[in-house]
């Protein structure tokens, strides 16, 4: 996997439905908290879902799959398609993307059917994002990737979820970077502005970083320097 593809895969995978990515130092206590819940109730599907996504954040994809499979098993036993099975498919799909396993698209496809039937747009945002990453990072199909990311943008508008919109905009700008196409600058600047509107240092960072890549493609090196300074200072 080349450096550009690794960049988009690591930075922009939406894990679960939450975009407020936890700091590494907070992941272990969060994992321990959810494990305590499971000790009291081994069939607590919300704890299983949280553990699946926390291990995705921790980049322990095999552990994420372990909890995703447990969530799927219990969800199936309880016939809980709206939560258990849906989020099991999302978590498993994302974990398999990170492992470069084509099994991912089967899980994401099943999740898409369930989310559409329940009109769960916040879940669809994550699913479309995963499908876009699958298309770009496993098949190098940038056209399909953009299609999925824009579908995700439409879903964020329906559920009014600006943080997810910003992450999807980041993926769109990254695809244009992979194509050596500075068209992505427009989307990078939108992320940067959304980051300020939402007071999100993470989104400001991503917007500034992507903008600097776009200015590099445009050979506007003074703007690269400016946005790297902004990124450092969170301005």
What are these regions (language model features)?
Residues 4-16:
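Sec-dependent N-terminal signal peptides
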Residues 19:
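Phosphate-rich cofactor/ligand-interacting catalytic cores and adjacent structured alpha/beta frameworks
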Residues 2-6, 231-234:
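Intrinsically disordered, low-complexity polyampholyte segments enriched for Lys and acidic residues
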């Amino acid at each position: 996997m080349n450096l550009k593809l690794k960049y988009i895969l690591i930075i922009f995978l939406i894990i679960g439905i939450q975009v407020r990515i936890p700091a590494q130092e907070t992941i272990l206590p969060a994992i321990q908290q959810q494990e305590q819940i499971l000790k009291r109730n081994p069939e607590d599907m919300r704890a299983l879902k949280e553990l699946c996504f926390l291990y995705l954040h921790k980049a322990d994809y095999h552990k994420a799959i372990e909890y995703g499979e447990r969530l799927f098993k219990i969800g199936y036993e309880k016939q809980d398609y709206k939560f258990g099975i849906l989020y099991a498919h999302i978590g498993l799909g994302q974990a398999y993307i990170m492992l470069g396993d084509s099994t991912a698209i089967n899980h994401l496809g099943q999740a898409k059917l369930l989310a559409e039937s329940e009109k769960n747009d916040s879940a669809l945002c994550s699913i479309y994002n995963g499908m876009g990453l699958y298309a770009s990072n496993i098949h190098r199909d940038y056209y399909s990737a953009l299609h999925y990311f824009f579908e995700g943008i439409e879903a964020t508008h329906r559920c009014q979820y600006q943080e997810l919109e910003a992450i999807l905009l980041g993926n769109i700008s990254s695809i244009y970077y992979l194509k050596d196409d500075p068209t992505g600058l427009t989307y990078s600047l939108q992320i940067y502005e959304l980051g300020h509107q939402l007071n999100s240092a993470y989104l400001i960072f991503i917007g500034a970083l992507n903008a600097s890549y776009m200015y590099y493609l445009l050979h506007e090196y003074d703007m690269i320097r400016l946005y790297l300074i902004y990124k450092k200072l969170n301005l």
